Design a protein with these regions (language model features):
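Accessory carbohydrate-recognition regions in carbohydrate-active enzymes
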Residues: 1-181
Length: 181
């Protein structure tokens, strides 16, 4: 989900690494999470895919796992439930029975998750992840019971941009608010 000339591109991400600059590939069977920075139409790029968010229920899993079998917090998704149009995306995360929605405004992105009742639910954040590697520095500040802010710095040392052979350096600043519902 994005807007013309928008500063964020909220998208499901199906795999880290590989030929996946947009973050999403239809042939994959699982979603690793939803990221707020993407590039599309450029082939393999190896950067962005930052601020990964994944809703989960049940036992805590601290890594994403791998497409095709290694357990983690990623989830299979119901392709027939996908709805995508300009500025909006919706899908059912089958393993958790969570409905996920994404939308964007010119300067922000929003996610909404509908969790199954009577399940231990959580929203997991991966601040180190980027499509082609990891960010090299992360900082988080807890603002209040429902808000965090911070930044992540991405440099060639963390991979990306041709496996770190380029000189891509960028910093992503963020603020996240979590309603108490």
């Amino acid at each position: 989900a994005t807007t013309p000339f928008g500063m964020v591109q909220v998208s499901p991400n199906t795999i880290t690494g590989g030929d996946n600059g947009s973050g999403y590939s239809y042939e994959h069977e699982t979603i690793e999470g939803f990221a707020f920075t993407q590039m599309s139409g450029i082939g393999w790029y190896g950067d962005l895919g930052n601020l990964l968010v994944m809703p989960t229920v049940g036992d805590l899993r601290t890594n994403s796992g791998k497409e095709g079998g290694v357990a983690g917090y990623r989830s299979r998704y119901d392709k027939s439930s996908e709805e995508a149009k300009a500025g909006y995306y919706k899908v059912l995360l089958s393993d958790y029975q969570i409905q996920a929605e994404a939308t964007a405004a010119p300067h922000s992105g929003m996610l909404r998750f509908v969790f199954p009742e009577n399940k231990q639910s959580r929203i997991q954040l991966d601040l180190a992840r980027r499509v082609g590697g990891t960010s090299t520095y992360q900082a988080v500040q807890v603002i209040d019971d429902h808000t965090i802010a911070g930044r992540m710095e991405c440099t060639p040392e963390g991979g990306g941009w041709g496996n770190g052979e380029g000189s891509s350096r960028y910093t992503v600043y963020f603020m996240r608010s979590f309603p108490n519902r």
